[in-house]
Amino acid sequence: MELSSPSKKTTTSPINIPGGNRDNLIIGPHSHSFKTDPFSSNNSSLLSKISTNPSLESPFSSKSLLDCSPVQAVKKSLESEAKTHSLDEETNEQTDVKILNIADFPTDELILMISALLNRIITANDETTDVSQQVSDETEDELLTPILAFYGKNVPEIAVVQYLERIQKYCPTTNDIFLSLLVYFDRISKNYGHSSERNGCAKQLFVMDSGNIHRLLITGVTICTKFLSDFFYSNSRYAKVGGISLQELNHLELQFLILCDFKLLVSVEEMQKYANLLYKFWNDQ
């Protein structure tokens, strides 16, 4: 008898997931009622019931993810393009030496490390960018359409670490998925670097801040798990865990792929490099 090889299948689970039903969204409804957003919603938020205010400290600029020292002061503007350098330029001769064992490192600790890094980035960017101004002035810019899709009407109150822990609790995954998120975010920041405004000043198109980080995380985990893992869940489950509607998650998947230029492959060497730099960041802070 011929046996066919098993194909990848989405999985579901009957466990109860609090705070994510069809009428109540954890991170609130989508922000845009203008024509670039076909999925606006009037659903209410459960933030006050399930979250606490995050404590965000320390600066990171809105350049590449790991390209600043933990004690560096926040830049007052994003015009110093000459000083902007990518994560690749931060690697040294010891990059290939394994510092963090991706396979065996505790996922809970990795989530804490990634959350600390992301908190630094979004705290700095919250101080240097005006999301409302960007949304109101640039809605006609085709380059910004996939970026603006990740902004909600209100800034979610749930902390990044709590959000990642929630994802891991109800849609458990592995370390390589979380590390790949850093790679994707860094690629997007490079793909959507600086553009010239009307006044001739340079402007960073893609900026991770408190207004878009939650949608970026749940969408990134959804896409990355499907691409890298043999085991993943249905979009309806990811949407419920992430606190957004299924329709919106489906839309955000495409926007995320556009931001990444549909390039999702991450080599072992690249992932290990990011893991080592993350570990170094954690020990230095």
From Swiss-Prot:
InterPro entries: Cyclin_PHO80-like (IPR013922). One of its GO terms (cellular component) is cytoplasm. Induction: Cell cycle regulated, with a peak in mid to late S phase. GO terms for molecular function: cyclin-dependent protein serine/threonine kinase regulator activity; protein kinase binding. Residues 1-14 have a biased composition (Low complexity). CDD domains: CYCLIN_ScPCL7-like. Its main location: cytoplasm. One of its GO terms (biological process) is regulation of glycogen biosynthetic process. Transmembrane segments: none annotated. Keywords: Carbohydrate metabolism, Cell cycle, Cell division, Cyclin, Cytoplasm, Glycogen metabolism, Phosphoprotein. The PCL7-PHO85 cyclin-CDK is inhibited by PHO81 in low-phosphate conditions. Pfam families: Cyclin. Forms a cyclin-CDK complex with PHO85. Interacts with the substrate proteins MMR1 and YJL084C. Interacts with the CDK inhibitor (CKI) PHO81. Present with 3390 molecules/cell in log phase SD medium. Cyclin partner of the cyclin-dependent kinase (CDK) PHO85. Together with cyclin PCL6, controls glycogen phosphorylase and glycogen synthase activities in response to nutrient availablility. The PCL7-PHO85 cyclin-CDK holoenzyme has GLC8 kinase activity and phosphorylates and inactivates the phosphatase PP1-2 inhibitor GLC8, causing activation of PP1-2, which then dephosphorylates and activates glycogen phosphorylase. PCL7-PHO85 also phosphorylates MMR1 and YJL084C. This is PHO85 cyclin-7. It comes from Saccharomyces cerevisiae (strain ATCC 204508 / S288c).
